[in-house]
């Protein structure tokens, strides 16, 4: 399809060349009549025609360079497209570091152990999953919890009484959740207007969200991807 488009573009350029040359040729043709103009008129017309010729040559040179650039980049088009696609997929899959605007959410104990008389528990996995789902529905594009990137196959679960994200323990408060979004203001408003704070408070956890004044950087997902279910497509 791209080769066809390039061919069409070149054809259009050639048509432009033909029209320009035709117009220039017609402008130089004059009927054979007796010239009654004085020398200054002739010189003025000659200068005008020379300028037209120079302009035409400049246009031809410009399109010639354009055609050369097409021929030079045509062979690189497939490789460039594949590379761009690969980088886009890596970005979407969370395999690259990413920097952008967003909000920061902190999760910490609401009341101390001395006040409740009970030990501080890890955040329940289901509660963190609920938070992630809500953030995604509010327009979150990228999320990390304690610098661990959240991707489609991230696993958050309780292992022997400790909440872990992809095998990393979340037992040290406060937890820091970084969230990137196209519209951080709207995301912040949605979080503040939701029932997330009350939901976390029911587990003796304080959830506080604030818009970051500086750019946030989320580290890439650093664990191997499970590709066992992927199959090679046959032609």
From Swiss-Prot:
InterPro entries for this protein: DUF881
A Gene Ontology cellular-component term: plasma membrane
Transmembrane segments: 6-26
Membrane topology type: Single-pass membrane protein
Keyword Transmembrane attached: yes
A Pfam cross-reference name: DUF881
Keywords: Cell membrane, Membrane, Transmembrane, Transmembrane helix
Protein location: Cell membrane
Listed PANTHER family: UPF0749 PROTEIN RV1825, UPF0749 PROTEIN YLXX
Family per similarity comment: Belongs to the UPF0749 family.
Protein name: UPF0749 protein YlxX
Gene (UniProt): ylxX
């Amino acid at each position: 399809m791209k080769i066809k488009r390039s061919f069409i573009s070149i054809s259009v350029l050639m048509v432009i060349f033909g029209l320009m040359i035709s117009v220039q040729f017609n402008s130089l043709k004059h009927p054979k009549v007796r010239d009654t103009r004085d020398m200054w008129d002739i010189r003025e017309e000659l200068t005008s025609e020379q300028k037209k010729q120079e302009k035409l040559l400049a246009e031809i040179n410009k399109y010639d360079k354009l055609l050369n650039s097409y021929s030079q980049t045509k062979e690189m088009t497939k490789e460039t497209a594949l590379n761009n696609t690969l980088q886009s997929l890596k970005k979407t899959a969370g395999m690259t570091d990413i920097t952008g605007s967003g909000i920061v959410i902190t999760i910490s104990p609401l009341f101390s152990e001395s006040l409740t008389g009970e030990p501080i528990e890890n955040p329940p996995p289901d509660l963190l999953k609920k938070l992630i789902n809500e953030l995604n529905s509010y327009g979150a594009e990228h999320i990390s919890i304690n610098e661990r990137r959240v991707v489609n196959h991230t696993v958050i679960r309780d292992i022997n009484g400790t909440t872990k994200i992809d095998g990393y323990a979340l037992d040290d408060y406060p937890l820091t959740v970084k969230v990137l979004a196209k519209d951080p203001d709207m995301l912040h408003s949605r979080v503040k207007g939701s029932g997330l704070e009350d939901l976390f408070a029911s587990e003796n956890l304080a959830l506080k969200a604030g818009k970051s004044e500086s750019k946030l950087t989320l580290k890439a997902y650093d664990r191997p991807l499970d590709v066992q279910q992927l199959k090679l497509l046959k032609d």
